[in-house]
Amino acid sequence: MTEYKLVVVGAGGVGKSALTIQLIQNHFVDEYDPTIEDSYRKQVVIDGETCLLDILDTAGQEEYSAMRDQYMRTGEGFLCVFAINNSKSFADINLYREQIKRVKDSDDVPMVLVGNKCDLPTRTVDTKQAQELAKSYGIPFIETSAKTRQGVEDAFYTLVREIRQYRMKKLNSNEDGNQGCMGLSCIVM
């Protein structure tokens, strides 16, 4: 069974835990209890493949920002979550993305941009804005509601698909790099 290490990042109060718990336990938590760090595991079938999702739900509060580098190192893919009724959380997405790229030492990291709380009528971040940001990053964008479950599975499953593509790309580039060697080792003296 293939394991995928997913990390849920974003500002405090955007619904990272609510999304994760909705996926894992099929239930909505509506009281706000700031997370320090929680880990969840769930076996699912995505595109006919049985997968083990290892999901790290992270702290959005600034006082826990020192912990971010560590979990960003271990994560394979990232759900970058903002709340559609919180423009600051949307602006913060770039900070998370830049930190992920720095820690991973790569511009090519599997990510999905997630606009949560789409069930609320008080939108301050336009869907088009988010779509344009995701397009500029070259990543998918999905609107979700942890309350109604809209888009929840889609967000996590899309991230798994992004990780799969990334793994295949790395595998293919490694194979391409080895073609000229014909399995022989070279020593430079």
UniProtKB/Swiss-Prot annotation:
Record keywords, A-Z: Cell membrane, Golgi apparatus, GTP-binding, Hydrolase, Lipoprotein, Membrane, Methylation, Nucleotide-binding, Palmitate, Prenylation
Highest taxon of source: Eukaryota
EC main group: hydrolase
GO cellular component terms attached to this protein's record: Golgi membrane; plasma membrane
Record region (Hypervariable region): 166-185
Keyword Membrane: yes
Topology of the protein relative to the lipid bilayer: Lipid-anchor
Entry keyword annotation includes Lipoprotein: yes
EC number: 3.6.5.2
Family: Belongs to the small GTPase superfamily. Ras family.
Record function comment: Ras proteins bind GDP/GTP and possess intrinsic GTPase activity.
Protein name: GTPase NRas
Lineage: Eukaryota, Metazoa, Chordata, Craniata, Vertebrata
The encoding gene: NRAS
